[in-house]
Amino acid sequence: MTGLIGRFGIAAMLLAGTAAARAQISGDVVRVGVLNDTAGVFQDTNGPGSVITARLAAEDFAGGGRGIRVEIVQGDHQNKADIGSAIARRWLDVEGVDAIVDVPNSAVGLAVNTVARDSRMALLASSTATSDLTGRACSPNTVQWVTDSYAIGRTAARAMMERGGQSWFFLTVDYALGHAIQRDAGEFIEANGGRVMGAARHPLGATDFSSLLLQAQASRANVIGLANASPDSGNAIKQAAEFGLTRNQRLVAFLMFVNDVHAIGLQAAQGLLLMEAFYWDMNDETRAFSRRFQERMGRPPSTNQAGVYSATLAYLRAVAASGTDDARQAIPAMKRAPFQDPLFGETYIRQDGRTVHAMHLFEVKRPEESRGPWDYYRLVQTVPGEQAFRPLAEGGCPLLR
């Protein structure tokens, strides 16, 4: 098992002054490693599609006007922290990878964060969702893109409580992501007068949720919070609809993507509330990008795949601006000033590594409301980044001491 399953070279046109421009680029090439799950539970929301969006970012970077060559490599962490950290260590020590991007699965993300912390390698954690990554585990070499458990947990909980959902039962995937979502959402619920009636845990990749859903039903909670991700959330939603739970209890998906809605269908998913930082049909820019992706992948991108594009492009531009691919200089360059991200809008990166941008609350459309395939969301509310993400002073990031 090598973990390296693909290598794609993307060379920019050589320009005058290339040698000088690349003087601080290690090995005369910037290598970006897409580390994700290529054949397991996250292959649809990440997998090969994340490699495509990383390549699109490299193409759009086009050498940064300085002839900087970019190479994209891919590794499969198999949702195992030891495998993910071993790939990261080999990429750092042997293969000259300068930045790792993507990394769905919070346990793997935290392990890779440890490898990158004291190195020259950047971690662009566009799919690692635990808020601990920019809290107690923050690193000067790590940037967390897209979302985190605090943002999705609290904004979704607030929206549901405003709609009368005062009592909650959690279905929680039993690893770092699920624990963090339940913690962050539960703290908000109880601090605002709600009650957590109970929780039931399940392994990653569970297929039978019947006993857990019966526990949720017996709790008589107003809301069943799905503290998990695809495909677990999709399986739970389908089975909840089959059992008739949605007649008396409301479901909230904290971390679910348009791919999951497509897989389970509007009949089962209709009325579901969920938080996303990106939706392919949000505006002209997201639609244009999604058309490019769809030409290669046959469907629109997920939020995680969009995050790989934006994080990779921002990193490459920081490399060009700082003149080096050393994370200890490139990451500070990323944090230097706010910027207009093509997919996520007005964006800035805080000192703890948290990327701040707007988050969006969507409701899944009824079948008769959809205009066709992938037209699944109705925008309910846009939450400014300053309200969605945890305040800088509250995360406990050691970098701020």
Locations of regions flagged by a protein language model:
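Extracytosolic ligand-binding ectodomains
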Residues: 2-4, 8, 21-401
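Leucine-biased recognition of intrinsically disordered, low-complexity hydrophobic segments
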Residues: 4, 14-15
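N-terminal signal peptide c-region/cleavage motif recognized by signal peptidases
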Residues: 16-20
